[in-house]
Amino acid sequence: MSTPAAGNLLLDVQRLSKRFGGVVASAGVDLQVFEGEVHALIGPNGAGKTTLVAQLAGQLRPDSGRIAFAGSDITRLSPHERARRGLARSFQITRLFRSFDVAGNVALAVQAAGSLETTVRVREVLDEIGLSDESAARIDALSHGEQRALEVGLAIASRPRLVLLDEPMAGMGHDESRRMEALIARLRRHTTVLLIEHDVDAVFRLADRVSVLVSGQVIASSSPEAVRGDAGVIEAYLGKE
């Protein structure tokens, strides 16, 4: 996939560090995400990817470093304040309201974002995630892939400028993974995507740029082609897959 015309710097992470006791989860992470791109973050299990995403979304506060979003320092802002500025996150584990149907879940997310056009926006989101025909279905009637798609729908309900997708293809079979790939490809038309994903083949198909996180540090950040051929990345990660 070719890289789109360079957009403005949207997310700028500088020297972000986080420890849990004696365990270093983030060791001076530097990361830049530009508007309009799909930027993928890959790395082995335990590399610190989910910890980094939690810091970006505000669920964890870094020990040191700086996070800037759209030119403003958001390092100490709450998740709610970050969401109001246009930064949204989906989760590895679905956080769906099982007492509501599919449309009801999306409506709650739309209303939480302060939209006054709930019905219209719910319809738009369901179309985007491919669940229009399941709008009245209960959550337990959905497949694993459909539940993950709905989780993405909740994240984009507020029309964020940047959406953090934390391993959206985890636990999926081939067909469901390809449907999620198609969904992510659609998202790029109107939002920037930071994709954290273990499926490197999907990453190389989808991403404009790829960053590789190993032992809490970004060791490479470039085009998919450059990352795939990087000797250091092959030795530290890709050669062990």
Where are these regions (language model features)?
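Glycine-rich phosphate-binding loops of nucleotide-dependent enzymes
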Residues: 2-241
